[in-house]
């Protein structure tokens, strides 16, 4: 295969995956956050994940996660997940929902790999490698960060409940 053909294929596939990512991302931005509350079981953190610690132990996520670009840099409508707006319960909950959205976007953007099943093996191999290397680190980062934030959120909720009960009982 000529260099020209390889470059042309690379350009076409880059455009394809960029279009897929942007389309899925924009489609999911239109999805109300209430969906991520209603279907929270789809985003359940399993006990064997040990609140995300498993992913950090296996892949040392805390060493490289800061290299992942924040999507909000490219699309102003995307919530910036680098920092919490504040430590208010509503902001923490909103961040958790946006992390669920980010995870789902990356899972959904992997689905089009099926298009390449009938393609020559080297094309399929290259695209599978791309999907795994581009999407899986982000999914794993969400699976590492979100359980920790959810745990913090639950602790804050319990603490706030106790504080409210103490205030009511002292009245």
From Swiss-Prot:
GO cellular component: plasma membrane
Annotated localization: Cell membrane
EC number: 2.3.1.-
Pathway(s) per entry: Carotenoid biosynthesis; staphyloxanthin biosynthesis; staphyloxanthin from farnesyl diphosphate: step 5/5
Cell division in keyword set: no
Keyword Transferase found: yes
Matching InterPro entries: CrtO
Family: Belongs to the acyltransferase CrtO family.
Function: Catalyzes the acylation of glycosyl-4,4'-diaponeurosporenoate, i.e. the esterification of glucose at the C6'' position with the carboxyl group of the C(15) fatty acid 12-methyltetradecanoic acid, to yield staphyloxanthin. This is the last step in the biosynthesis of this orange pigment, present in most staphylococci strains.
This protein's name: Glycosyl-4,4'-diaponeurosporenoate acyltransferase
The organism of origin for this protein: Staphylococcus haemolyticus (strain JCSC1435)
Encoding gene per record: crtO
């Amino acid at each position: 295969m000529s260099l020209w053909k390889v470059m042309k294929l690379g350009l076409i596939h880059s455009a394809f995956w960029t279009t897929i990512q942007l389309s899925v991302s924009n489609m999911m931005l239109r999805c109300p956050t209430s969906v991520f509350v209603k279907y929270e079981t789809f985003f359940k953190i399993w006990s064997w994940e040990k609140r995300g610690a498993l992913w950090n132990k296996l892949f040392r996520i805390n060493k490289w996660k800061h290299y992942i670009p924040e999507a909000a840099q490219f699309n102003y409508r995307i919530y910036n997940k680098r920092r919490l707006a504040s430590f208010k319960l509503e902001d923490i909950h909103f961040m958790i929902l946006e992390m669920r959205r980010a995870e789902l976007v990356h899972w959904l953007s992997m689905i089009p790999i099926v298009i390449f099943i009938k393609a020559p093996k080297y094309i399929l191999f290259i695209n599978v490698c791309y999907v795994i290397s581009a999407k899986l680190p982000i999914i794993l980062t969400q699976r590492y960060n979100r359980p920790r934030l959810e745990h913090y959120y639950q602790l804050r909720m319990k603490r706030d409940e106790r504080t409210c009960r103490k205030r009511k009982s002292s009245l």
